[in-house]
């Protein structure tokens, strides 16, 4: 959730009125104390990351016939992939690695794409346009009256050259279309 940029000073306790930036937790607390004083420009946003995420299973296995421990929801080790020095990377990084690309499947429990390489000992997960759409529609169905914005973070991690085979900028295009749908055509929780 992204807090409103402009808040009524009535929402803030005196010690916060002249502090910039106001911490998110304090802003949310202030908003809950006096919702009648919310600015008419108050809005909420869902932030969508365009990067994928690397995990190493805590308990590896070498079973060649299936995911085994290389799936979402299994315990993970706390280590970072040494060749990228962080847990997230552009999705193209994994899509151009044949062992990951050939193993990509949609995990229907977590609504995410997952690929793995048991020799390397890593799994990679990201949201496709379809899994993002399903998650956002499910979230919207739970709060139908709430107007929200969709914010794409790390858009440089989007596949703009179609190396993953899902279409160039497929997730950003879907987010734009879904934002317009939510703003102008969404009527009930049955609209999934």
PLM regions: where:
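Substrate-binding surface in catalytic domains of secreted glycosidases
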Residues: 1-88
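Surface-exposed intrinsically disordered loops and tails
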Residues: 13-26, 94, 102-106, 116-117, ...
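Generic preference for hydrophobic/aromatic residues in regular secondary structure cores
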Residues: 13-22, 114-117, 121-127, 148, ...
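Acidic-enriched, low-complexity/disordered segments with a strong bias for Aspartate over Glutamate
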Residues: 15, 59-63, 83, 107, ...
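Generic secondary-structure transition motif, activating predominantly at the C-termini of alpha-helices
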Residues: 20, 32, 80, 96, ...
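Residue-level detector of intrinsically disordered, flexible termini
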Residues: 24-26, 35, 93, 111, ...
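Hydrophobic, secondary-structure "cap" segments at the distal end of domains
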Residues: 76-144
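Acidic/aromatic/glycine-rich contiguous surface patches that form carbohydrate-binding/processing clefts
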Residues: 122, 127-192
């Amino acid at each position: 959730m992204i807090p409103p940029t402009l808040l009524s000073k009535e929402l803030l306790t005196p010690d916060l009125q002249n502090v910039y930036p106001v911490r998110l937790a304090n802003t949310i607390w202030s908003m809950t104390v006096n919702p009648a004083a919310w600015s008419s420009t108050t809005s909420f946003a869902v932030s969508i990351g365009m990067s994928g995420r690397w995990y190493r299973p805590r308990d590896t296995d070498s079973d060649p016939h299936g995911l085994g421990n290389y799936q979402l929801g299994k315990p993970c080790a706390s280590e970072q992939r040494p060749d990228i020095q962080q847990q997230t990377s552009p999705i193209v990084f994994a899509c151009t690695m044949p062992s990951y690309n050939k193993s990509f499947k949609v995990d229907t429990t977590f609504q995410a794409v997952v690929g793995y390489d048991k020799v390397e000992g890593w799994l990679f997960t990201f949201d496709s346009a379809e899994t993002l759409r399903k998650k956002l529609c499910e979230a919207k169905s739970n709060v139908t009256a709430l107007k929200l914005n969709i914010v794409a973070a790390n858009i440089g991690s989007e596949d703009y050259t179609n190396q993953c085979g899902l279409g160039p900028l497929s997730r950003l295009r879907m987010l734009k279309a879904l934002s317009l749908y939510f703003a102008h055509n969404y009527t009930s929780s049955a609209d999934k």
